[in-house]
A protein has these predicted regions:
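Basic, low-complexity intrinsically disordered segments
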Residues: 1-168
Length: 168
């Protein structure tokens, strides 16, 4: 083996490993964010001591957890994520070996991206851009186009802003 080949081989394996690690971390953080949303919504609906925390629940949660990045803003986003994408529950349950978290609300399966495909192909930053769209078919359209065209978040944001969905 020549030195150049050795160096190229090591560089290549390092790049592949780094890429796989980034992808795995992103997938786990996406699933974590969904689970956080699930637990917050479940608590808001059924928590026996919820009256004690009331409208300050997320702020109190941030203070109690006291961990960088887990803050009121993220908790709001996670709650919305859970409500918009309830179908991800099965993926979260299997990945974290939790009891079946199932679907909380009714979502038409007609325009729903497979949760495993969604989590494996879109970053949470992509999902965050898409989940603010009110129309399920529009979300499905951007999820599909984003995966098909391999858009980065900036390009996705641009396509949403220029109403590609309406123009297509």
């Amino acid at each position: 083996m020549k030195f150049e080949l050795l160096a190229d081989s090591i560089k290549q394996i390092n790049e592949k490993a780094s890429s796989a690690a980034k992808s795995a971390v992103n997938q786990l953080m996406t699933l974590r964010n969904w689970a956080i949303g699930y637990y917050i919504v479940e608590y808001e609906q059924d928590g026996s001591d919820r009256a004690e925390y009331g409208s300050h629940l997320l702020k109190n949660l941030e203070k109690k957890i006291d961990y960088k990045g887990l803050n009121e803003t993220l908790f709001k986003v996670c709650r919305q994520f859970y409500k918009v994408y309830p179908q991800i529950g099965s993926t979260v349950s299997s990945k974290f070996k939790l009891p079946d978290l199932g679907k909380s609300s009714t979502v038409s399966n007609e325009f729903v991206t497979n949760p495993d495909v969604l989590v494996n192909n879109l970053s949470f930053s992509h999902i965050r851009e898409i989940m603010v769209l009110n129309d399920a078919f529009e979300r499905f359209f951007y999820e599909t186009e984003c995966m098909k065209c391999n858009w980065n978040v900036r390009e996705l944001r641009r396509q949403i802003k220029t109403n590609l969905y309406v123009r297509a």
